[in-house]
Amino acid sequence: IAILEDDASDGGRWSADTLVMLLNDVTEWLVELKETKYPDLKTDLLFCPGWMAYANSMSGNDSDVQKIQKLHEGTGDNVRIVMTGGKIWGDVTTAFADRFYNKLAEKKEPGRYPYLWVNWPCNDNTKDSLVMGGHNNILRTNLDGSKYQGVILNPMQDSEPSKVAIFTASDFCWKIWKDTDEGDQAWDDAFKYIDHMTPISSESSDALREIAKHMITQSPGQAGKQGEFDESVEIKDKLAAFRS
């Protein structure tokens, strides 16, 4: 279950006290259901704050950060505070997780690590692009996986192309990549499963992978916010020569 306040307004619509009461009431309800009706029910509760501390990366002391600190102080460990990585178009890094934890620990020990909602392969700001790659720009190698309570994606409006990111992120979360080659291998493997759900490549899965090689880069405006994802890498020199 998730309660989402994101984009409600600057700083969110509701006060920290109101949200703490809501989250604790819902937690009590979930625990009651688990004890009386549904023994396998999970009581984890995701909560996404209104502004998700985009601009300050959890390093300041403004009202956004103070609100999240109060949520940490007033709720149990079952509440997962959802963030986007210190900015709207964030990535999965140990550095942000540590800043988040330490900022919450200033008010209550121990701190709490974030649940990351990464805006990838989301193409809301680049609707003329399909983001069918860019994994190594988002899913950072040698991450300390214990420092995130979870990682979820914001997919594109196009469901089928989004499966490339879903597959690669699933591989990453199952076993954090030690180097970018592991990420590239996961990306390469994705198309066999997307196309026909086996580990054996086929003519159609190879064709899908070939198309995807050239459908990765975002529009210039989006690339400036997120870091540009390279595409057509294997023919990059030939393209440059042709354009010149």
Predicted regions and their residues:
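Basic (Lys/Arg-enriched) interaction patch that binds polyanionic ligands
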Residues: L4
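Catalytic-core regions of glycoside hydrolase
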Residues: A8-D184
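C-terminal functional modules
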Residues: K178-S244
